[in-house]
Amino acid sequence: MDGFAGGLGVRPVAAEDGHARLEFEAREEHLNPAGTLHGGVLATLVDTAMGLAARSTAEDGVPATSQLTVTYLRPGRPGMITATAEVRKQGEHLLVCDAEVEQEGRSLVYALATFAVVRH
């Protein structure tokens, strides 16, 4: 994976038919002063997973995040993190996706996003 998410170490596992899955190894440098996984890292994971899911369905155009709601359920710790995403509704100009981040089988984050399909 290239760009910002790739620089963090995010690894795409699958992205097809409106579904995506990512893996991420959280390390000490990803923690906040409280010693838990920084919320910005978790937001990046859900946005990236939903973007991959959205792109897997967009035949013509590029989905761009227009709204993102992130609900933090519990803190993350160093270790393997998994993010999964799914396109829930697809229209001509907008897509709605949701995503979940898990660690050791426990939900850390639930997110919902709207993507605008940008055509060039």
Question: Which functions belong to the PLM regions below?
Answer:
Residues 5-7, 17, 45-49, 63-67, ...:
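Short connector loops at helix/strand junctions that flank enzyme active sites
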Residues 59, 74-78, 82-120:
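HotDog/MaoC-like acyl-thioester-processing domains
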Residues 12-13, 62, 87:
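Short secondary-structure boundary/capping segments
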Residues 32-35, 120:
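A short, polar/proline- and glycine-enriched secondary-structure boundary/capping micro-motif
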Residues 37-62:
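Active-site helix/loop of acyl-thioester processing domains in fatty-acid/polyketide metabolism
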Residues 1-23, 28:
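Non-catalytic linker/capping segments at the edges of enzyme domains
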Residues 26-32, 42:
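A short interface-forming secondary-structure element
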